[in-house]
A protein has these predicted regions:
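Acidic, His/Gly-rich catalytic cores of divalent-metal-dependent hydrolytic chemistry
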Residues: 183-189
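Phosphate-handling substructures
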Residues: 66-123
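GST superfamily/GST-like fold recognition
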Residues: 145-149, 174
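Generic beta-sheet signal
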Residues: 4, 49, 135-146
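A glycine-biased structural micro-motif
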Residues: 46, 86-89, 136
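Active-site-proximal alpha-helix that buttresses catalytic centers in soluble enzyme cores
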Residues: 2, 7-71
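Domain-level recognition of soluble alpha/beta enzyme cores
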Residues: 157-182
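Short beta-strand scaffold positions
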Residues: 53-54, 122, 142-143
Length: 189
């Protein structure tokens, strides 16, 4: 049995403190985000793990807090947000009012020019499979909330986007993922 720690990067350093739709926008961590990374690294300091990370800076900086070699996997990147990538939510509300309002009720409505949820999920699952094949024992996957939420929702149904710096612990046994806190729910991989 292997333990997999899915770790969402810490809080990014948003320009002028305005939250934005990040997608592939490459921001560093804020001071709070660096602290979040150090906090979770403390919790994992005695764990023997292989660390995999998205290539985006906020994920790499988070992974660096673990003080272990990092294997970068391109397919761990966040979903592309298309035309919304890098825009503040106020800019999105102004430029795309109909889609913004509709997505408040249904997050499956695609963003203009963005990667589809299906393509993103397939990409992330391929990255998870690659990480499993390239490592022995336990591993940490440092990445992004949107893509992780898709994976978790697809396999465990009711799941919210992980918070900044949050760790989700899964067990992997005989081709299935099991939520550590609820071993009744599992997914074959």
């Amino acid at each position: 049995m292997r333990t997999i720690y899915l770790i969402r990067h810490g809080l990014p350093d948003f320009p002028l403190g305005q939250r934005m739709c990040l997608g592939r926008t490459d921001l560093p961590l804020s001071q709070e985000g660096l602290k979040q990374a150090e906090d979770f690294a403390e919790k994992l300091k005695n764990q023997e793990i292989t660390v995999f990370s998205s290539p985006l800076l906020r994920a790499r900086q988070t992974a660096e807090a673990l003080h272990r070699p990092i294997i970068i996997l391109e397919d761990l990147q966040e979903l592309s947000a298309g035309e919304w990538d890098g825009l503040t939510f106020q800019e999105i509300r102004t430029r795309y009012p109909e889609i913004y309002a509709a997505r408040a009720a249904d997050k499956t409505i695609p963003l203009p020019g963005a990667e589809s949820n299906e393509d993103g999920l397939k990409r992330f699952e391929n990255a998870m499979q690659t990480a499993m094949e390239q490592s022995q024992g336990n591993l940490a996957i440092v990445g992004h909330g949107g893509i992780m939420a898709l994976f978790l929702k697809a396999h465990f149904r009711h799941w919210e986007k992980p918070g900044y710096g949050q760790i989700i612990t899964l067990l992997y046994d005989n081709g299935r993922f099991i939520k550590q806190e609820d071993s009744q729910k599992c997914v074959h991989f």
